[in-house]
Amino acid sequence: MNILQNLKESDPIISNLINSEKNRQETHLELIASENFASMAVMQAQGSVLTNKYAEGLPQKRYYGGCEFVDEIEELAIERAKQLFDADWANVQPHSGAQANAAVFLSLLKPGDTILGMDLSHGGHLTHGSPVNMSGKWFNAVHYGVDKETNKLNFNEIRDIALATKPKLIICGYSAYPRKIDFESFRRIADEVGAFLMADIAHIAGLVATKLHPNPIPYCDVVTTTTHKTLRGPRGGLILCKDKEFGKKFDKSVFPGTQGGPLEHIIAAKAVAFGEALKPNFVNYSKQVINNAKVLSSTLIKRGIDIVSGGTDNHIVLLDLRSINMTGKVADLLVSEVNITANKNTVPFDPESPFVTSGLRLGTAALTTRGFNDDAFVEVGEIIADRLLNPDDLLTEKKCKERVLTLCNRFPLYEVELEASIK
């Protein structure tokens, strides 16, 4: 076998499927809040010869030889992560956000300990104590939600739950909460009940890095995140701490506690993404992400579609479809038929099951990467509203699909052939 063959020659089936996915991304409006488009540089790092290197352990403390260059790469990723988030300690090895959270649990908790996180149906995450996840099986998980009137965090209610349940760990940071998080108020509650405080900023990491969202580092014992989403890096995880000595306990929980060898090609891609996020133009990008979300939210509200909490402070726009007598499952299908990619999502106090839902979650990070601006997002909002408010109108469906293609052609994704990035 010639290992120098390119993908098209060695496996045309996979090559064709990748090209089909590339075409889908280019010709659809990507509004899934947890997705973004990585740069060519990030993808080049992921597809590099670093894929071949095994490197158990930490830089300068490996169990294998030949790690001198991956040590430099990982050390650079660590330093850039610390600089980006004003942290004194970082571990860049977690394979995902879920793995980062698992490592924190292994360090701070024992089976049966009580953890307090947001209810999944209110915008929490599976790894914050859902009964279908190990976090809900190994620990006594209790939950808080949002206020029924405002759909925002109610710290008096959260405090009452914490005082009643005395959790060992309180988790803040969410997957479908569109408002700013008051980490200082969480810190006061954690101190009052003697709990550790963890922030999972997977969705808002890019906004935190650019100081457009409050930074949890000064208030939380530990912070976890993914490196894609608003940070626009490779799919992976990261753990951060303000206290360097406290942070060291998580090193052993990552390896050998929950993982084996790190993925050095992904760590290199993380380093590239952190470097990109440290540049001034990433601040401008993040500002536009938030502005686009506000424009999208206001456009939909004007068309009579309710938005959870009445708006957004980040990249997430969560539609409450009860306002138009529609389920999330139906809405997801309707927008997908005109080449808009989103996901059905529960809303607070949702009467529907998680398989049906009353909400549709949208995010602006990916399309902002393509260059979508205020005017473009007005059009995105109008297309979505036209489709949802006229579900049985075939002419509207046809016109919406044409308008989507016009936007995609106006804002091309990758203007050069992706194969060029790996030659």
Swiss-Prot record:
Assembly information from the UniProt record: Homodimer.
Q: Which UniProt keywords apply?
A: Amino-acid biosynthesis, Cytoplasm, One-carbon metabolism, Pyridoxal phosphate, Transferase
Could you tell me what this protein is called?
Serine hydroxymethyltransferase
Question: Which family would the database say this protein is a member of?
Answer: Belongs to the SHMT family.
| Presence of the UniProt keyword Iron in the record | no
EC no. given is 2.1.2.1
Required cofactor(s): pyridoxal 5'-phosphate
Q: What class of enzyme is it?
A: transferase
Gene symbol of the encoding locus: glyA
Q: What does this protein do?
A: Catalyzes the reversible interconversion of serine and glycine with tetrahydrofolate (THF) serving as the one-carbon carrier. This reaction serves as the major source of one-carbon groups required for the biosynthesis of purines, thymidylate, methionine, and other important biomolecules. Also exhibits THF-independent aldolase activity toward beta-hydroxyamino acids, producing glycine and aldehydes, via a retro-aldol mechanism.
The cross-references to PROSITE patterns, in alphabetical order and at most eight, read: SHMT
Give the Pfam families listed for this entry.
SHMT
Q: Where is this site: Plays an important role in substrate specificity?
A: H228
Q: In which pathway does it act?
A: One-carbon metabolism; tetrahydrofolate interconversion; Amino-acid biosynthesis; glycine biosynthesis; glycine from L-serine: step 1/1
List every position bearing N6-(pyridoxal phosphate)lysine.
K229
The entry marks the following residues as binding (6S)-5,6,7,8-tetrahydrofolate, namely L120, G124, H125, L126, S353, P354, F355
Single GO MF descriptor: glycine hydroxymethyltransferase activity
Q: Does the keyword Iron apply?
A: no
InterPro entries for the chain: PyrdxlP-dep_Trfase, PyrdxlP-dep_Trfase_major, PyrdxlP-dep_Trfase_small, Ser_HO-MeTrfase, Ser_HO-MeTrfase-like, Ser_HO-MeTrfase_PLP_BS, SHMT-like_dom
Q: Which GO terms describe its cellular component?
A: cytosol
| Biological-process GO terms, alphabetical | glycine biosynthetic process from serine; tetrahydrofolate interconversion
**What organism is this sequence from?**
Prochlorococcus marinus subsp. pastoris (strain CCMP1986 / NIES-2087 / MED4)
Taxonomic classification: Bacteria, Bacillati, Cyanobacteriota, Cyanophyceae, Synechococcales
Enumerate the CDD domains for this protein: SHMT
Please write the reaction equations for the catalytic activity of this protein. (6R)-5,10-methylene-5,6,7,8-tetrahydrofolate + glycine + H2O = (6S)-5,6,7,8-tetrahydrofolate + L-serine
Q: Where in the cell is it found?
A: Cytoplasm
